[in-house]
């Protein structure tokens, strides 16, 4: 999420 790489969790 932080790098904008889905589906990475934004925790």
From Swiss-Prot:
Protein function: Mediates visceral muscle contractile activity (myotropic activity).
The name this protein goes by in its record: Periviscerokinin-3
Compartment annotation: Secreted
Keyword annotations from UniProtKB, A to Z: Amidation, Neuropeptide, Secreted
GO cellular component: extracellular region; mitochondrial small ribosomal subunit
Family of this protein: Belongs to the periviscerokinin family.
Molecular function in Gene Ontology: structural constituent of ribosome
Highest taxon, organism lineage: Eukaryota
GO biological process, one term: translation
Modified residues (Valine amide): 11
InterPro entries: Periviscerokinin
Main location group: secreted
Extent of the signal sequence: none
Record carries keyword Ion transport: no
């Amino acid at each position: 999420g932080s790098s904008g790489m889905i589906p990475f969790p934004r925790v």
